[in-house]
Amino acid sequence: MNEAVSPGALSTLFTDARTHNGWREPPVSDETLREIYAQMKWGPTSANCSPARIVFIRTAEGKERLRPALSSGNLQKTLTAPVTAIVAWDSEFYERLPQLFPHGDARSWFTSSPQLAEETAFRNSSMQAAYLIVACRALGLDTGPMSGFDRQYVDDAFFAGSTLKSNLLINIGYGDSSKLFARLPRLSFEEACGLL
């Protein structure tokens, strides 16, 4: 049986963690980005399909390529973030299933149903984005996930000629707590859950 993590760890990962809009100076190293992926990749996906593909934008040139896709409310926080991750999904993720899930012909489950392939890729890449957020928090970083952007523009600017499609953006860095909004409420257990 696994041991529960400490209350302090739960606070870091969930109860005290915030979505950040402002950032402090320290950069995020490429080694740290590699460590984020090294942790998040172990999160479960259906049939181990692992459809997420991530572009970590950490240069001014990369941010300028992204700028036209951003909504006005997300512009400044993204341009000043040390890193912005484009979390995309690979529409042909199933081509890696002989390696990732070598139990029967899992590839055929998706080649025979494009709708199932798309639903699976989008759903599981969304889960992987959540794992990325938790990995960042576990490594002492803050995040700011966003869906307010022009996905078609991002796909054309970053993924033209590929099988990748953007899902969401996540700003990554060391947050400036002085720029946080007041903490918003969450639904109670009774409002969000049922017991049968």
Curated annotation (Swiss-Prot):
Covalent S-S links between cysteines: none
Keyword vocabulary terms for this entry: Flavoprotein, FMN, NAD, NADP, Oxidoreductase
Designated gene of the protein: rutE
GO terms, molecular function: 3-hydroxypropionate dehydrogenase (NADP+) activity
Name of the protein in question: Probable malonic semialdehyde reductase RutE
The reaction(s) this protein catalyses: 3-hydroxypropanoate + NADP(+) = 3-oxopropanoate + NADPH + H(+)
Enzyme Commission no: 1.1.1.298
Family: Belongs to the nitroreductase family. HadB/RutE subfamily.
Gene3D superfamilies referenced in this protein's UniProt entry, alphabetically: NADH Oxidase (3.40.109.10)
Induction details: Up-regulated by the nitrogen regulatory protein C (NtrC also called GlnG) and repressed by RutR.
Entry's Gene Ontology BP terms: nitrogen utilization; uracil catabolic process
Functional note: May reduce toxic product malonic semialdehyde to 3-hydroxypropionic acid, which is excreted.
HAMAP family named in the record: Oxidoreductase_RutE_HadB
Requisite cofactors: FMN
